[in-house]
Amino acid sequence: MDVLNKSIQTALEALPKTSSSSSDGVSLVSLKCQLLLSYVQKLAFLMLVKLDDESFLQHQDVVEKLVQLRIEIEKIRPLENRIQYSVDKLLRAAGRKEEIGSIKEPENNGNDKDSQDSLKLHYKPNLSEFADDSDGPASENNVVKEDDKSSISSEDEEEELRSAKDGIYRPPRIRAVTMDSEKRTRHRPNHLVDEFVSSDMSSVPQSMPSVGSNLEKRGRVIHADERELQKMRERIEYEESNYTRLPKLSKKDLKKSKRVKKHDYGGEDWSLLDRKFHDDDFSNRKLDLTSRAKRRANFEDVNDGSLASPVQIGQSYRKRKKNLKRR
């Protein structure tokens, strides 16, 4: 105990005589310091007891107090994490105390509001730094004059002062932005070409089933139809495993499934051998009013029995053939 008392006495003498008041500080931090100090004192006392070969049972109250302090310190830790942001903010504010104190207060009391506004504008970003810096020689268009910079800054200051008065937020006008009005067409990849390039023009060996060997899976199909077939297989598998019927397919899905079966023969897809110059989607596009009127007039001439050109007769024949296929 004498050694402990001497060490404490020397530590007290090393401390400054006038200690700063902590009434305006964070109470949680002060409490943590007090708890840590008490915990260290109790722990040092028990170490001395252990050195004297005494039992802890004689100092049971000190052990209980030590456990209580340990629990309180652990309970403070989550609270300290919550106020960590506020503590860091206060520390940064204390570090900037000298910078803030260097700004002189206005002498007249009537200009307090204007001084506060000017103090806010003191920390605004430098708008001249937002200009693009080109690597090449500076041209007359890229060089910003000092008069323009001052006019821009004055306009921004007026805008900020106006928004501060009426309470309406107005974004800073740093640079004019033009919105793109033109719609860009999306390039849709051709799956047939991709499959041809990846399979036929590649030198990498591939394992392909023989003709007619996988009829249950509809044989070899193109990449575009493979996804539709996979969806149909999953649908059938779900119905068979759950003993239930799913809702009927929509007209769009039925049309896709028929399109898959259209060029299927013997478990193989022969659509590449029957490609027309004009695709079905291209031929089914809606014509303009003048084209439809001409076709209607030509069709009426043929039905009336009047003479028509071979081109008109061929058009009417193809139209009738197309209608019969739809039936």
Curated annotation (Swiss-Prot):
Task: Give start-end positions of Basic residues composition bias.
Answer: 317-327
The UniProt keyword set, sorted, is: Phosphoprotein
Chain residue ranges for the region called Disordered: 127-170, 298-327
A Pfam family of this chain? Sas10_Utp3
Highest taxon, organism lineage: Eukaryota
Q: Which GO terms describe its molecular function?
A: RNA binding
PTM Phosphoserine: list the residues: S153, S154, S309
Q: Name one GO cellular component term.
A: nucleolus
Q: Does the keyword Methyltransferase apply?
A: no
BP terms from Gene Ontology: maturation of SSU-rRNA from tricistronic rRNA transcript (SSU-rRNA, 5.8S rRNA, LSU-rRNA)
PANTHER family cross-referenced by the UniProt entry = NEUROGUIDIN (PTHR13237:SF9), SOMETHING ABOUT SILENCING PROTEIN 10-RELATED (PTHR13237)
Q: Spell out the protein name for this chain.
A: Uncharacterized protein C18B11.06
Q: Which organism is it from?
A: Schizosaccharomyces pombe (strain 972 / ATCC 24843)
